[in-house]
Structures are given as structure tokens and as C-alpha cells.
A protein has these predicted regions:
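Outer-membrane beta-barrel domain signature, strongest for Gram-negative TonB-dependent receptors
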Residues: 1-103, 304-308
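Outer-membrane beta-barrel signature, preferentially recognizing the C-terminal barrel domain
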Residues: 2-26, 163-176, 228, 257-316, ...
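Transmembrane beta-strands of outer-membrane beta-barrel pores
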Residues: 28, 41-47, 53, 79, ...
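Short loop/turn motifs that connect adjacent beta-strands in outer-membrane beta-barrel proteins
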Residues: 29-34, 94-103, 189, 246, ...
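Signature of Gram-negative outer-membrane beta-barrel scaffolds
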Residues: 74, 78, 90, 94-244, ...
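Surface-exposed extracellular loop regions of Gram-negative outer-membrane beta-barrel proteins
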Residues: 138-157, 165, 245-292, 307, ...
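Gram-negative outer-membrane beta-barrel transporters
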Residues: 311-316, 334-434
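C-terminal beta-signal and adjacent terminal beta-strands/loops
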Residues: 429-439, 460-513
Length: 513
């Protein structure tokens, strides 16, 4: 069902963050044992106060409220409060290994996070608007005297809203960890680091599912339910070989983990009022375990200049991807664990002053990455794709990894002259086309088209102590758009969404005490 519509969106967001750091360092008189500790509490909040979204169906030069197509006008209040407490205790012991200096590091950490999230939604419904004056498309008119419902005409707009329990949740994440690793030299040119990290992770959830929210007593009411708890070991090993005094060769192997966020591992259904897309949490998510191999060759110049060439390989078990919820609800998306995946690539980077060509105040910074990724489709995804395949279409058991670009380019040319106080730069970056949302059945995949970002900034420091600074910034100089498209076999690529951020200018002034 296609239609033409327009949406007026007015948003106000208020954010705050309050943090503190308590830390200390202690050592023995001989400096063979050092102790570092830190305690860092953080309070943060986000309040979206009175988001107003008004949608009209616009056809034949008329405006209409069409709930089945554009939805009712909405007013939404969202509130997120989070407390984070990070604690660390680290020991460093100096000693000798085979007659050479070595260091053993060991310690523990504990991280605690608490989140409270709530959405209040009210709909502006309408009754018998056809009996009133024609709508003009102005959002304010729906609450004017001419359109607000009254008992005499029994026609007009009115507010309707209920507390949606499934869109409110509380969560706790607790991570207790300990580690030990040893840094030592095998010979004058070769250094090795080996270690092991242990983590006990627990996540708890309070909230209700969709069924319980719709009909209390018929669904599930979670009260600090343990939704994720595991004990993991993360080994690491790296080898650093000094080719000469200006270059190193590094090899590394290590294991990491990616865990679902509060939002991902919830029963909440969170709508983006601007796009109409709904994010649906998933309480069945599990950890993603990542095994990593990498190598790097780096050459050093004076003044922190470097040239580096890297290669890497990653193996993902149970990666989390954003997937269309169902064939019947392709505009609703949910994070899900999918089949195992691999990512391999190479990166070249350079940071070089251009003084060798007579431009000592200019510096080139750039890096380029080329990446290959592959995900094994799980049985349900593969079967649904085969069942809905078009004539001549061959469905592969693998595909690209969601969110992974095949290439990345970053390039910047910086100018810095401390004598006259001028500094600035021109910066460009782009990522290759990547899978944004995994389709389901006959609903196609959504891809994000490369966005070419070209930005410029210029700063002037002045004053006796250079305490004043004027700045000019220009972002998206070429006025590129952020486009997402549907991609399917033997078809054109219609837009899923397009956004034109435009070119932006920024003026700044700073005074340093």
C-alpha cells in the first residue's frame, strides 16, 4: 500500500553527565612494586521532552489524518537515567627474566551499571474531521479552537494515551574481572607479552513483555530476572620484534567479547518518530565471542611520524546483527544472534610531515582499510531466502556481515604554525557500501550507500599568551546525502531512506585562563 505523506517533527533533548575520578599511586622505595587504583562514578541522563510528530497524507492537494498509513500525531516523553561505577586496582612488579628486565602486571576491576528507562506516549486522535474546515498541513492547527473536540459538534481532535509498561525497563550490569600478564624479552630484539583475563558478567532485567503490557496477568513480568550470566577467559599473546632502531614487527593473538546492551537485551519497543521505524529488543541474545589474529609493521620517523602496514583476521561466534523483525513487519527491526562470521583485512596508514618538500607546517594523515567479511546464514534465514527466491536467483549460504564496510578511507591535510598562531585542516572520509539491515523472506536487504564527508576547519590563536582562539568550521562541504537503499535480485534499488544534512558552518571563540 503506497501513499504520499508529510511529517512535521519538533524535538527537544536535554542531556547531562556528572563524573568524578578518585585515584592514587603507591610504590615501594625500590620501585619494584607499584600500585595504582581508581574509582570513577558517573551519573548521566537523557530527557527527550515533548517530542511532537504530526503526519499527514498529502494527495490531490489535500491533507488528511490517516492512522492506517501515516499514524496518529504523537507527543512523546522519554527519560533515561544511568549510574556507572568503575573500579580498578593494578599492581606492577618489576623483576628479571633470564637476566633481562621484565614486568608482571596483575589486578582486578569491578564495573557496575544501572539504567532506568521510560517512554510516555500520547496520541492526538480525531473524530469526524470531515465535518470541520479542510486541513492545511500546519501542525499547530490540530489544537486550535476550530479543531479541538467539543461536546456541541462532537467532532475534532482529542488526546488519548496510556502508560505502556513494555516500553519501560530497568537493568543492571555487573562485571567482576581479574587479570595477569607478563612482559619480558626473549633476546635483545624480541619482546613478548602473554596474559589471561577472567570475567564474571551478570545482567539483570526488570520489565514486562508485550503480552503482559496488553493484558496484565497473561504474559511475563520480569523482576530483576538474570538474563545473562557467564564466566569467560580471555587469553592474549603478542610478540614485538625490533627490525632496527626505527621499525618494529608485531604479531598478536587474543580473544575478546561483545555483549548485548541494555536496549538490545530488553523487551522494549522503541519507535523512531522521525522515520517510523521501531526497534524491538531481544531478551534471547547471547554474547559474541571474537578470536583475533593481527600483525603490523611500523616504521618511525622523528617527531612522531609513522608509516604502518597491518593485517588482521577475526572469527565471530554468535555475532549480533540488526534484522527485519518479520515478513509481515519489515519496518520493525530486532537484534539477533546469527551464524558464525569471519572478517579479514589489511590497513595502510601514514602520518608524515611534508617538510621534505619545503612545507614543514603541513602534515599528511591518512589510512586505508580493505576488508572482507562473511557470515554463515542460519537455517531459518537461508530457508526463507530460498523459498522466496526469484527465477534465476541463486541463494548463497554466506553473505556480507551486517554493518561491515568493504573499505574505509580517511585522509587529512593539517597545517600548524605556532609562530603565527594559525592552524587548520582539510579532512575527507568515506566508508564503502555496507549491509544496514538484514532482510527476511521476500523483504530485501537494506544497504547504506557511501557518504563522502569533506570537512574544513581553521583556527587562529592570539593574545600575549595565545589565550584567545577564533575558529571557523565547515562540514559536509560537498553537501552529500546519507542514503539507504533496498537491494534485491534483478531489480532497481529504491530508497529505504534518504537524509540531506546539508552544509553546516560553525564559528567559535575560546578563552583559556
Amino acid at each position: 500500500n503506497s501513499f504520499v505523506g508529510s511529517r512535521d517533527n519538533l524535538e527537544y533533548s536535554q542531556r547531562s553527565i556528572t563524573s568524578a575520578l578518585f585515584s592514587g599511586q603507591h610504590s615501594r622505595d625500590d620501585n619494584k612494586l607499584k600500585i595504582d587504583w581508581r574509582i570513577a562514578p558517573t551519573f548521566s541522563s537523557i530527557a527527550d521532552k515533548d517530542i511532537r510528530s504530526t503526519s499527514y497524507r498529502t494527495e490531490d492537494n489535500t491533507f488528511a489524518i490517516a492512522p492506517g498509513e501515516t499514524g496518529f500525531p504523537n507527543r512523546i516523553w522519554r527519560e533515561l537515567n544511568e549510574f556507572n561505577l568503575a573500579n580498578r586496582l593494578d599492581f606492577t612488579r618489576s623483576h628479571e627474566f633470564r637476566g633481562r628486565d621484565a614486568k608482571m602486571k596483575y589486578g582486578a576491576s569491578y564495573t557496575f551499571k544501572y539504567r532506568d528507562y521510560e517512554i510516555l506516549r500520547y496520541q492526538l486522535r480525531a473524530k469526524s474531521l470531515g465535518n470541520l474546515n479542510p486541513l492545511t498541513g500546519e501542525a499547530d492547527e490540530l489544537l486550535s479552537e476550530d479543531f479541538v473536540w467539543n461536546v456541541i459538534t462532537d467532532a475534532g481532535t482529542y488526546y488519548s494515551g496510556n502508560y505502556e509498561a513494555n516500553n519501560a525497563y530497568q537493568g543492571i550490569q555487573s562485571n567482576l574481572a581479574g587479570y595477569i600478564h607478563e612482559e619480558f624479552s626473549l633476546n635483545p630484539l624480541t619482546k613478548m607479552v602473554v596474559g589471561l583475563r577472567m570475567e564474571r558478567y551478570d545482567q539483570f532485567y526488570t520489565g514486562v513483555d508485550q503480552q503482559e503490557a496488553a493484558a496484565p496477568g497473561t504474559g511475563i513480568n520480569y523482576q530483576w530476572e538474570p538474563v545473562l550470566n557467564n564466566f569467560n577467559l580471555f587469553p592474549t599473546a603478542s610478540l614485538i620484534y625490533s627490525v632496527n632502531e626505527n621499525s618494529n614487527l608485531r604479531f598478536g593473538a587474543f580473544r575478546t567479547v561483545a555483549r548485548p546492551s541494555f536496549k538490545e537485551k530488553s523487551a522494549a519497543q522503541i519507535e523512531d518518530v522521525l522515520t517510523g521505524i521501531t526497534f524491538i529488543g531481544n531478551l534471547d541474545l547471547t554474547n559474541t565471542t571474537i578470536s583475533n589474529l593481527d600483525f603490523r609493521y611500523e616504521y618511525f620517523f622523528e617527531g612522531g611520524q609513522t608509516i604502518g602496514l597491518s593485517g588482521f583476521y577475526k572469527y565471530f561466534q554468535n555475532p549480533i546483527e540488526l534484522v527485519a523483525y518479520s515478513a509481515a513487519a519489515p519496518s520493525n527491526f530486532q537484534p539477533r544472534n546469527v551464524g558464525n562470521a569471519t572478517v579479514a583485512g589489511a590497513e595502510f596508514e601514514v602520518r608524515k610531515n611534508l617538510g621534505f618538500i619545503g612545507m614543514k607546517h603541513l602534515e599528511l594523515n591518512s589510512n586505508f582499510s580493505y576488508i572482507l567479511s562473511s557470515v554463515t546464514r542460519d537455517s531459518s534465514e537461508f530457508a526463507a531466502r530460498v523459498a522466496s527466491a526469484r527465477e534465476g536467483e541463486v541463494i548463497s549460504e554466506t553473505r556480507a556481515m551486517q554493518g561491515q564496510s568493504p573499505y574505509l578511507i580517511n585522509a587529512g591535510l593539517s597545517y600548524n604554525n605556532p609562530k603565527n598562531g594559525w592552524q587548520g585542516g582539510l579532512f575527507y572520509n568515506v566508508q564503502g557500501e555496507k549491509l544496514y539491515i538484514v532482510g527476511v523472506a521476500d523483504n530485501p536487504d537494506v544497504f547504506e550507500v557511501p557518504f563522502h564527508s569533506l570537512n574544513f576547519n581553521l583556527l587562529k590563536n592570539f593574545g600575549a599568551d595565545r589565550q584567545y582562539q577564533l575558529g571557523l568550521g565547515v562540514n559536509n562541504i560537498i553537501e552529500d546525502t546519507r542514503d539507504r537503499i533496498f537491494r534485491s535480485y534483478n531489480s532497481h534499488s529504491p530508497f529505504f531512506s534518504t537524509w540531506a544534512p546539508g552544509r553546516t558552518f560553525k564559528l567559535s571563540f575560546r578563552y583559556s585562563l
